[in-house]
Amino acid sequence: MESLKLSKKELLNLYNSELDELLEKSSKFVKDEVEFCSIVNARSGKCSQDCKYCAQSSHYRTHIETYPLLDKSEVEKAEKEAKTFGAHRFAVVTSGKNPAEEDFHKVLSLVDVLNSVEGMNSCASLGILDDEMAKKLSEHGLKRYHHNINTCRSYYPEICSTHTFDERVKTCKLVKKYGMELCCGVILGMGETVEQRIEMAMELAEIEPDSIPINILMPIPETPFEKYHDKIDEENILRTLAVFKIANPNAVLRFCGGRMRLSDENQRLALKTCVEGIMIGNYLTTIGKEPSEDIAMVKELGKKIK
């Protein structure tokens, strides 16, 4: 499907149009099937970066559980469990700006484990990559790499000072250079303006990811954004999702962390009109819904599980 290549003004006008009309427009790009994926937090905490939303940053006293890289048997067990829940894609996620050199060979062995489970597609989220790392991941058969932009370029300095928006985009380009699929999304509700949400949609359209994970901020105590409970409401979440889908018709919009900030009714509405994927189970440092509830919701909507 050819991208519409709408201008910022056109997307903003869509954002501010009647909600029913907006959702009707976005629904034209939605398939009748929903993808399920899942993750394992394979290394937790002690991250050197100062992302203001993140429980895993060593800059904040968030009291989360920290641990080194999981071994192969633990990852394989988690992937097989995710498969029983209906996931067809599974990702290893590690904390930190990028993979530590001494850990990278272990990470590659985890990719091999992911690829060994029949019927599952491998994914990894390891932070910022250099050329050699991206090449090695591709050589080991990694199907998809996840790396969010998190917000738009103009707002990025407000959420992080230890790396740049451009560093993130560079990693996205490396992923595509070496033939891997790209999963690249955002976190909504971090204080961005409506105009900046439009910028996110347009910047993602330039990157052209295969999947766009949509996270909604779940404020973590002891982080700088701990009081950001009211930066986006349910209607504006729906409006943002619709505009993202219209601007990125070929990408699968995916519900990820924080979607419980939407009512069950609005989660269903989003799945009808703009969202085609769900991360099932728990997230990195927050709790998700029971997979059985998500399966039931999708079936009630008359959609197939991919």
Show which residues each predicted segment covers:
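Residue-level signature of catalytic and energy-coupling elements of molecular machines
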Residues: 18, 51, 147
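N-terminal pre-triad scaffold of radical SAM enzymes
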Residues: 21, 27-60, 67-91, 212
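Hydrophobic faces of well-ordered beta-strands that scaffold small-molecule active sites
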Residues: 34-41, 90, 122-124, 145-147, ...
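Glycine-rich, proline-tolerant flexible connector loops at the mouths of alpha/beta enzymes
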Residues: 34-41, 61-64, 91-104, 155-156, ...
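Conserved short loop/turn motifs at secondary-structure junctions
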Residues: 39-42, 96-97, 126, 188-190, ...
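Conserved Radical SAM active-site core
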Residues: 60-185, 189-199, 203-207
